[in-house]
Amino acid sequence: MAFSKSWASALMKVAFAAFAMSAALLSGCSEQKPAFASVDVTGADYAKNFELTDHNGQVRHLTDFAGKVVVIFFGYTQCPDVCPTSMTELAEVKTLLGKDGERVQGLFVTVDPERDTPELLKAYMANFDPSFLALRASPEQLALLAKDYKVYYKKVPGSTATSYTMDHSAGSYVYDTKGQLRLFTRYGSGAKVLAADIALLFR
């Protein structure tokens, strides 16, 4: 009888240890995958890099910003609402993050290279944050980039040849400090929501 009790006791200890280990592993897994408010696109096989010229004339790649969280928005300078709102909110995100805000790089890719000259883009970025960069491509490069990023844009004719507007996707792509695409944040989510998500990426 004593032999049976010792075996039962040993089996209970083994079972408890296995349960504790499983719980620890599950806990570890849950900690590795934080709950983002934005759309989690971790592991996406698109939008991995780019080669564009910034408003200072320097050729840029995603790898240039290693160590920073990169937020990319596609828009144009004559956009009346979505674009300035998105860039203003991104500037607010930097403020909300305090010192970590210095490790956030805002990038604005114009979908209107015909009108958005480097000089105009530079002046436009100055309205939001001095560290933000505007990026520009040729119409052919832009078409390929938009396909890779799954971005929609289309010229809408106006009353004159230069008074057209641009329909385009509204949202931002967020990369972690290792240059991996992690999030897509929808337009209108707000600065506080994006700041909280970026804070999780810095952990």
Task: Annotate each PLM feature.
Residues 122-169:
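Short, internal strand/loop/helix patches
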Residues 25-28:
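C-terminal motif of bacterial Sec signal peptides marking the signal peptidase cleavage site
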Residues 30-32:
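Bacterial signal peptide processing site
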Residues 2-16:
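Bacterial N-terminal signal peptides that target proteins for export
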Residues 68-69, 85-109:
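Conserved helix-turn-beta segment immediately C-terminal to the redox Cys motif
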Residues 159-203:
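Thiol-/selenol-based redox modules, centered on thioredoxin-like
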Residues 62-86, 90:
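Short active-site neighborhood of thiol/selenol oxidoreductases, capturing the structured segment around
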Residues 103-116, 131-140:
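Thiol-based oxidoreductase modules, predominantly thioredoxin-like and allied folds used
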